[in-house]
Amino acid sequence: MLVAAFAAAGEEVEGNPTYPILPHLGELIVGIIFAIIIYAVIAKKVVPRLEAMYEERRAAIEGNVEKAEKAQAEAQVALEQYKAQLADARGEANRIREEARQQGAQILAEMREQAQAESERITTAARATIEAERVQATAQLRAEVGRLATDLAGRIVGESLQDSARQSGVVDRFLADLERSESGASSR
């Protein structure tokens, strides 16, 4: 039947010539039917697959964009944490440096104080030793001067002054008079 329709469409109809540009009615109907069939197949089979592929691609792109934004946000948070940690570390380093400086100054002050105390202790001990030696030397000199004075007086007088109580009294009196005369001379 189709073939007949095609055959009929290609012939002249009652003396009217057919135009090669104008399709025959049978061809037109067959073309429309095939176009509808192709459209239906494309609409039912191809378009949903294309839509699904398009949706998958769009979701993948959006997912990648979201992942990139999320990664960028995480990187920004990590950068902020790093900056905060770096600022904390710098503050801690400054604090430790200042503590070390203060401890160094404190240790230096303590060492100076200890050195000063040691110096004063040594000076005091030296003065005490010198004073003790001076007292001892003075006592020895008094005894020696007394003995020499007694010997000299005994020679001058011609009698022995070996009595120790008497000798001691004479020497002490003589030295006391001598000290008084020196004190009187220095105060003038």
Curated annotation (Swiss-Prot):
The source's superkingdom equals Bacteria
Its chief place of residence is membrane
Record carries keyword Transmembrane helix: yes
Q: Which residues cross the membrane?
A: 21-41
Membrane-topology descriptor:
Single-pass membrane protein
Query: Looking at the keywords, is Membrane present?
Result: yes
GO terms of molecular function:
proton-transporting ATP synthase activity, rotational mechanism; proton-transporting ATPase activity, rotational mechanism
What does the function comment of this entry state?
A: F(1)F(0) ATP synthase produces ATP from ADP in the presence of a proton or sodium gradient. F-type ATPases consist of two structural domains, F(1) containing the extramembraneous catalytic core and F(0) containing the membrane proton channel, linked together by a central stalk and a peripheral stalk. During catalysis, ATP synthesis in the catalytic domain of F(1) is coupled via a rotary mechanism of the central stalk subunits to proton translocation. Component of the F(0) channel, it forms part of the peripheral stalk, linking F(1) to F(0).
Q: Tell me what this protein is called.
A: ATP synthase subunit b
The protein's organism comes out as: Kineococcus radiotolerans (strain ATCC BAA-149 / DSM 14245 / SRS30216)
Upper classification of the source organism reads: Bacteria, Bacillati, Actinomycetota, Actinomycetes, Kineosporiales
